[in-house]
């Protein structure tokens, strides 16, 4: 099993941080679901697709409110907060492989940070624009929004 992970929102101005993971057993699991980057979808279409994705596939969602984000950022970085959140939703699904949208200018470093937060073996691949290039991450992006 593999999963894709993405997030939406990042702090007091934007509201809560919502992190979502969507799991697939094969790439064909997404057949019939027109996933693309959630920013390109109208809200009604995004809601319809989110319902379809979460009905057909295993998913995990974590919501971190803006107060908790602000408190964490007093002593640590936003990248670490998001990496830990990515790891939490990955851990709920326990895939062998996870694709995450990189939140660091060095994508490979971000992938290592997420992997270090996991307590089970999982190959984590972090990529910039993964929400545009990997359908499973696009699906997670739709669910997160």
Give the role of each language-model region:
Residues 1-3, 7-145:
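Acidic (Asp/Glu) carboxylate-rich active-site/surface patches
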